[in-house]
Design a protein with these regions (language model features):
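Short strand-turn motif at the edge of the Rossmann-like AdoMet-binding core
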Residues: 151, 176-178, 188-193
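A short glycine-rich, Lys/Arg-flanked "PGG" loop and its adjoining helix->strand segment in the class I
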Residues: 158-183
């Protein structure tokens, strides 16, 4: 159960989420609505996200994270690691969206994970675990997918993620193309001109334009990159 006080402006900002996603339970709605006042409170103590972004949290952080949910549908029981989660993105929004999926959020900065743990507890998320560790130091764990947002060059992300990934099992792609299947891999959110970064990574990712999912100006030149195992 979510115990946080939900402020009126948080409910208003939720409209951009409900513009694209409508089939939420009451619990999910309450969890999403609670995020804004919680992040606003914590951000006044610890600089978790850019202070100018707090007023557009639902677009620039939550909806951006949920672009992965618009492209991928993870089955219950899927294990996902969020590499360099920072303040909990994309892990926390995805954990709310997929309550049957297990998310392991890792970061090297302890104070940020303190916020992640507090928010997770406050909104009643049961499918998140948190670990203060660098991704390359994670041992004896396997995951179906690794996700990340604006953490490191693709070359490094793939070097860290590949050893952590299970052997392929299929999932189905979400709303954009309903039939193809995806095997385990790295899913990362990136922006700008990625040609050189992709070339230097030694990978051949599938690149999805987020602006084709969410046409808001903020999502121009922002992409989902998927690198299969």
């Amino acid at each position: 159960m979510c115990h946080s006080r939900v402020l009126p402006y948080a409910i208003g900002q939720m409209e951009i989420i409900l513009k694209y996603f409508t089939e939420f339970t009451d619990q999910q709605l309450n969890q999403f609505k609670a995020l804004e006042p919680l992040y606003r409170e914590w951000n006044s103590k610890i600089n978790i996200i850019s202070r100018k972004d707090v007023d557009s949290l639902y677009e620039k952080h939550i909806l951006h994270s949920l672009s992965i949910a618009a492209a991928f549908e993870f089955v219950d029981g899927t294990e996902i690691i969020d590499i360099g989660t920072g303040g909990g993105f994309p892990g926390i929004p995805l954990a709310i969206f997929f309550p049957g999926v297990n998310f392991h959020l890792v970061d090297s900065i302890a104070k940020k994970l303190k916020v992640v743990e507090a928010i997770t507890k406050d909104i009643g998320l049961k499918n998140i675990t948190v670990q203060h560790i660098r991704a390359e130091e994670v041992k004896n764990r396997k995951f179906d997918f690794a996700v990340s947002r604006a953490v490191a060059p693709l070359k490094d992300l793939w070097k860290w993620a590949k050893p952590l990934l299970e052997n392929p099992i299929p999932i189905t792609i979400g709303t954009q193309k309903p039939n193809p299947q995806f095997s385990p891999g790295l899913i990362c959110l990136k922006g700008g001109d990625l040609a050189q970064e992709i070339s230097e990574s030694g990978t051949r990712p599938r690149v999805m334009e987020i602006s084709e999912i969410f046409p808001e100006e903020f999502f121009r030149e922002k992409y989902i990159l998927y690198v299969p195992r």
